[in-house]
Amino acid sequence: MQNIVDSIYQEMRSRTDRGKVANYIPQLACVDPNQFALTVVTQEGEVFSAGCAQTLFSIQSISKVFTLTMALGKLGDALWAQVGREPSGDPFNSIVQLEHEGGIPRNPFINAGAIAVADAIMGHNEPKETLAEILHFVRFVANDDSISIDEKVAQSEMMTGSRNASLAHFMASFERLENPVDKVLGTYFHHCSISMTTEQLARAGMFLVSNGTNHCTGMRVVPEHRARRINSLMLMCGHYDGSGEFAYRVGLPGKSGVGGGILAIAPGKASIAVWSPGLDKIGNSKLGTEALEMLVQETGWSIFGH
């Protein structure tokens, strides 16, 4: 496996079209686009890495996998009264669909859906308490207490997050939010600003590899049926309106973030994290997707067969 990971890294290093870093969040715009990291953690707990696997990056929307997991733990199926389970087909920050569907977001991975999930997790707690809870959970699944929120990225997002504020106010106008908009947004922007390495992120995804149990720690995180359903949502909705393309090319449940990261799950096989800051036109990591495409070709890990 290390040879496969190393060969993918060397191939990605040689590619010149690396996409473009997200420029609408100032703190992300200054990230070096030439960085690349890939980590594979197998079901048995073996770790294979190449590139900048110890470099922290902003996980952004990948955090929505963890907040969704938490919300389902708190609310169970009642969550689905607040957010749908269908692919959107629209950009991740689109307001059009939200208007047509009465303020109920299409799925928990688009921005409006993740804002609704953040509201659900809050209950009636303050953002500070909720964020401590989210951070505790991410540290738990990664088995790493050093994971933290990058406050500079969070502030950068809050200063440039007008579209997300519009989404939240729009949902509030339909009485879809329980908490004040500013508090929900503060929670949302901060959990998107969690920083992790690919090694930490791949470890954090391990519970989705083994039917809800992290074999590295022996801890059950979610029931078996819930792990399966989270994976199904990642497959259908994890790459916004590029989810079909990702399923076609890679064939794994995955969740991307505009920081250039992707968490991909090969059920029964491995948790994979890749980071390359340059994005394609939809907003997913360009080389990250290409690297995962190479990985499944080499391993036969696509859920659709060899």
UniProtKB/Swiss-Prot annotation:
Going by the UniProt record, its keywords in alphabetical order are:
Hydrolase
Q: Which InterPro entries match?
A: Beta-lactam/transpept-like, Glutaminase
Which residues of this UniProt protein bind substrate? Answer: 61, 111, 157, 164, 188, 240, 258
Q: Which domain of life is it from?
A: Bacteria
Which Gene Ontology MF annotations are present? glutaminase activity
Binding partners and assembly = Homotetramer.
Q: Which family does it belong to?
A: Belongs to the glutaminase family.
**Name assigned to this protein:** Glutaminase
This chain's source organism reads: Pseudoalteromonas atlantica (strain T6c / ATCC BAA-1087)
Provide the organism lineage as a comma list. Answer: Bacteria, Pseudomonadati, Pseudomonadota, Gammaproteobacteria, Alteromonadales
Task: Supply the gene name.
Answer: glsA
